[in-house]
Amino acid sequence: MSQLMEELSFRGLIQQQTDEEGLTKLLAEEKIKLYSGFDPTADSLHIGHLLPILTLRRFQEAGHHPIALVGGATGLIGDPSFKKAERSLNPAEIVEHWSDKIKGQLSQFLDFEAGENPAVIVNNYDWISQMNVITFLRDIGKNFGVNFMLAKDIVSSRIETGISYTEFSYVILQSLDFLNLYRNENCKLQIGGSDQWGNITSGLELIRKSEAEGAKAFGLTMPLVTKADGTKFGKTEGGAIWLDKEKTSPYEFYQFWINTDDRDVVKYLKYFTFLSKEEIASYEEKVQTAPEKREAQRRLAEEVTTLVHGRESLEQAVNISNALFKGEIKSLSAEEVKVGFKDVPSMEKSSTEELTLVDLLVESKLSPSKRQAREDITNGAVSINGERQTDKDYVLSAEDRIENQFTVLRRGKKKYFLVTYK
C-alpha cells in the first residue's frame, strides 16, 4: 500500500473506492491528477466542504496534482443527491459571483505556485456552456440508460416526491466533468463525500463507454462527518459554520471546535488536522485520562482555525475566549468586544450622557425594576466589563468605556448587554 493510502486509511478518510488494488498500485507508481467538485450554492464554502478540500491538500503534499472544480454550470442546475425536494434555481449572475468567491476560498488551502505540482482551479461552465443540446444528447446522453439512472440512489430516492428533468440530468453533467478532465487533463481520480458515490461511478461509466478500451479512472469517497450526539455536523442554533469570516467570525468558528464532544474529538483530529499519528495518539490518551482539561479540543480548535483563518485570527479568538472565561473583558480591544458580543442585545448611548448603573440595568431589561436593580448591585450580581460593581448609586465614567466605544454589562453569570457609544 502506498504511504498516502496508509495515511488516508489511518485517518478514516476512505469510505468507498471503485478499485482499491488498482488505485493503490497507480498511486505507488506515479503522481496523478485528481479532482473534487464544489458547486456554488452560497457565497461561501462551509465546514462540510473541509474534508474534500483537505484531502486534496493531502494528495498535493504527497506530490500529486489536485484540481479544484468550481461548478459554475452544475450550480445552475442543483445536485439532487439526498435532497428531499427540488432546489430553487439561482440566477446566473449570482451563481457566477458565488463561483468567484469560492475560487478565492479554495486558494487558502491549496498551493497554486508549487514548483513540481501546482494546484489548478477550473470551472465547468467553461465547457458545459459551449455544448449544444444536440451534441449533449447524441454524444453524452446516449451513454445513460434510463434504468441505469433510476437505479441510482440520488434519483430513486426522489421518485416518490418527484424530480424534474433538470435535476435528473445533473448526474450526466457531473459525469461530463470527469470525462472532460480525463480527456484534457489526464485526470484519473475523482474524490468526494459519500453522497457523491452515484455521481462519481456514473462518470467512470461514461469514461468506460466513451474512451478507447483500457481507459482507466478511479473514484474514492470520504465518510459523512457525524456527531456522537446525533445532531448534524456543521450546524449550530445560529445556522451553518461558514469558512468566510464575515459570515462566521473566527471566534465563533473557534468555539465550534472547542465544543466538540469527547467522543468525536480524536476522529476530528484525524479528519481535519495534519498532526502526526504520534501527536494524535497522545491526545487520545489525554481524552481518556483527563477529559476535563479538554486539551484535545483546544488543539483541534487551534489547528483548524489557523488553517482556515490564519494565526492572527486564532490569537484574537483565543483572547476573546480567555477573557470571557476569566471575566477579564476590560483586557479586550474594541474590535474583540465587537466580535465576541455581536449576538448580545445592545443599545446606543451618547458618550456625553450621564448614565447611572441602575437606569442602564432597567433600560437593558437585565433587571425588571429599579428596586431589583439596586438589590442586584448590592448583592454583587452586576459587573461592568467583567469587574463587579456594588455601589447602587454608581454613575458610569469614561474609564468604563472600552476604547470609548463599548461597555459590557453582566447580571448573574450569563446575562450580558452591550452599550455602544456615538
From Swiss-Prot:
GO biological process, one term: tyrosyl-tRNA aminoacylation
SUPFAM superfamilies to which the protein is assigned, alphabetical: Alpha-L RNA-binding motif (SSF55174), Nucleotidylyl transferase (SSF52374)
Taxonomic superkingdom: Bacteria
Residues that bind L-tyrosine: 35, 170, 174
Binding site for ATP: 235
EC number, as in UniProt: 6.1.1.1
Domain S4 RNA-binding intervals: 355-421
Entry keyword Cytoplasm: yes
Chaperone found in the keyword field: no
GO molecular function: ATP binding; RNA binding; tyrosine-tRNA ligase activity
Primary subcellular site in the record, as a coarse category: cytoplasm
Subcellular location: Cytoplasm
Short motif 'HIGH' region, span: 40-49
Gene Ontology cellular-component terms listed: cytosol
Short motif ('KMSKS' region): ranges: 232-236
Signal sequence annotation: none
Reactions catalysed according to its record: tRNA(Tyr) + L-tyrosine + ATP = L-tyrosyl-tRNA(Tyr) + AMP + diphosphate + H(+)
Keywords: Aminoacyl-tRNA synthetase, ATP-binding, Cytoplasm, Ligase, Nucleotide-binding, Protein biosynthesis, RNA-binding
Family: Belongs to the class-I aminoacyl-tRNA synthetase family. TyrS type 1 subfamily.
Subunit note: Homodimer.
Role, per record: Catalyzes the attachment of tyrosine to tRNA(Tyr) in a two-step reaction: tyrosine is first activated by ATP to form Tyr-AMP and then transferred to the acceptor end of tRNA(Tyr).
Name of the protein described by the UniProt record: Tyrosine--tRNA ligase
UniProt source species: Bacillus pumilus (strain SAFR-032)
